[in-house]
Amino acid sequence: MRNQDKRAAHKDSEPSTEVNHTASSYQGRQQETGMNLRGIDGNEPTEGSNLLNNNEKMQGTPAEPNHLQRRRQIHACPPRGLLARVITNVTMVILLWAVVWSVTGSECLPGGNLFGIIMLFYCAIIGGKLFGLIKLPTLPPLPPLLGMLLAGFLIRNVPVISDNIQIKHKWSSALRSIALSVILVRAGLGLDSNALKKLKGVCVRLSLGPCLIEACTSAVLAYFLMGLPWQWGFMLGFVLGAVSPAVVVPSMLLLQEGGYGVEKGIPTLLMAAGSFDDILAITGFNTCLGMAFSTGSTVFNVLKGVLEVIIGVVTGLVLGFFIQYFPSSDQDNLVWKRAFLVLGLSVLAVFSSTYFGFPGSGGLCTLVTAFLAGRGWASTKTDVEKVIAVAWDIFQPLLFGLIGAEVLITALRPETIGLCVATLGIAVLIRILVTYLMVCFAGFNIKEKIFISFAWLPKATVQAAIGSVALDTARSHGEKQLEGYGMDVLTVAFLSIIITAPVGSLLIGLLGPRLLQKAEQNKDEEDQGETSIQV
């Protein structure tokens, strides 16, 4: 019995030893903490000594003004803050160029093709950032695309810079075609069939009427004033007929946040109708493009244009239904795979349609494919749109920079510029009047009709995307006369962006708060804010 008791006592002592070891370590830490809490002389701190120590610390580290802190941060070693960010960004830019140079050699040196593309890309980004910094009170910010466009324009027309930054036409055309594919995918995914059903008549009228009338007006003016053939006149008309979502949508969102026109759904109407307006313009342009470069009788050209539309729609239906189900929803990285497929198929459609002699079918195929894919994806459509938006952030500076770089001042005749401005001005006035008529009998008052008419003015994105397509196609055919027609179309597109984008943005910002009714909820919030300020 005694042996059993000893064994039991021994077993009980084992865990107690562990507990004692833990307790001793805890006590050790407590002692260390206590030693740390003691003063230098080893005495325990009292309330008076704590106050004394705090005063000594405050006297030892006086508070510095903000400007001294900023200077200390700037002159710190190693650098921090803004200086550190600048050094990091410059290093990344130089590293990108150095990596490309190590692979391509002379192509990435001044005068080389890749050097020109990289420099144009950087300059366009800087130009867009600078324009984005221009902010006027109570007005929407100026669209950064203007800075990108002007950056490309300056690169081409400043002698010293243009000698060292040169881009081959083939590369420029290919990059613009890829950017066009990205725009078409975004337009197709952004189509909202439910919004069209809700707004019905007024949305359809606003999408079709101004675009078609402006296209016809521009075609007549281009034929009689500029001497363009009818097919080229209608191409120019559909280039001008599209409204710019890059200008209209941000401005509408600002008004919507302020509660202007929300009760009658004016911001929603303009954003929804803008997508259909752009698709109509792009489809009409592609159809006229195919007819303009067809050889044969007029009847044959018309039939070929209809055939291109049919080919584009049918191919888009097939591809759209395919990527609705592949990749399947149980796969990993589903969003990235879907974004890659829709972008890859769109780029392939645009390039292959030109290769097979049906240039008008590629854009329509892309629109139908993206629209059907978006309807099938429903739950992940928004995530795919975010990935496509990243691709657009990359190709937007290239697109607008390359468009600006295509315009050479010395190659333009003064009378050509005058005729282009006259054609643009008359077409825009007709568009404003037609837009006013299209929104009649839709429940809007006179002020709201005037606002919608001027809000339907800005042009930018679609003009940059398709404005140079005719010129690129003419260059591929090697006909100087057709290249001249293409240059006229591009010049009008360039002028339309430079003139209407900033003017339209400013008009929306100025007229919106003055002509649109404000929602009651926003009025109550403002009244409460004013009352609290008075109190």
From Swiss-Prot:
Residues spanning the signal sequence: none
Keywords: Cell membrane, Cell projection, Cilium, Cytoplasmic vesicle, Endosome, Flagellum, Lysosome, Membrane, Metal-binding, Mitochondrion, Sodium, Synapse, Transmembrane, Transmembrane helix
Molecular function in Gene Ontology: identical protein binding; lithium:proton antiporter activity; metal ion binding; sodium:proton antiporter activity
Ranges that cross the membrane: 86-103, 113-132, 144-160, 171-188, 200-226, 233-241, 270-289, 300-323, 339-356, 361-372, 390-410, 417-439, 461-472, 486-508
Localization in the cell: Cell membrane; Mitochondrion membrane; Endosome membrane; Recycling endosome membrane
GO cellular component: apical plasma membrane; basolateral plasma membrane; endosome membrane; lysosomal membrane; mitochondrial membrane; plasma membrane; recycling endosome; recycling endosome membrane
Stretches assigned to the Extracellular side: 104-112, 161-170, 227-232, 290-299, 357-360, 411-416, 473-485
Polar residues biased stretches: 16-34, 46-58
Biological-process GO terms, alphabetical: clathrin-dependent endocytosis; flagellated sperm motility; lithium ion transport; positive regulation of osteoclast development; regulation of insulin secretion involved in cellular response to glucose stimulus; sodium ion homeostasis; sodium ion transport
Domain of life: Eukaryota
Membrane side Cytoplasmic: residue ranges: 1-85, 133-143, 189-199, 242-269, 324-338, 373-389, 440-460, 509-535
Topology term for the membrane: Multi-pass membrane protein
Regulation: Allosterically inhibited by the N-terminal domain. Inhibited by phloretin.
Residue ranges of the region described as Disordered: 1-70
Catalytic activity: Li(+)(out) + H(+)(in) = Li(+)(in) + H(+)(out); Li(+)(in) + Na(+)(out) = Li(+)(out) + Na(+)(in); Na(+)(in) + H(+)(out) = Na(+)(out) + H(+)(in)
Residues that, per the record, bind Na(+): 243, 274, 277-278
Skewed-composition ranges (Basic and acidic residues): 1-14
Additional information: The subcellular localization of SLC9B2 remains controversial. Was initially thought to partially localize to mitochondria. However SLC9B2 does not seem to contain a mitochondrial targeting sequence. It was later established that its localizes predominantly in plasma membrane or intracellularly to endosomes and lysosomes. In another recent study, endogenous SLC9B2 in the distal tubular cell line mpkDCT4 is detected in recycling endosomes but absent in plasma membrane.
Task of the protein: Electroneutral Na(+) Li(+)/H(+) antiporter that extrudes Na(+) or Li(+) in exchange for external protons across the membrane. Uses the proton gradient/membrane potential to extrude sodium. Contributes to the regulation of intracellular pH and sodium homeostasis. Also able to mediate Na(+)/Li(+) antiporter activity in kidney. May play a physiological role in renal tubular function and blood pressure homeostasis. Plays an important role for insulin secretion and clathrin-mediated endocytosis in beta-cells. Involved in sperm motility and fertility.
Family: Belongs to the monovalent cation:proton antiporter 1 (CPA1) transporter (TC 2.A.36) family.
Binding partners and assembly: Homodimer; dimerization is essential for SLC9B2 activity. Lipids seem to play a role in the stabilization of the dimerization subdomain.
Name recorded for this polypeptide: Sodium/hydrogen exchanger 9B2
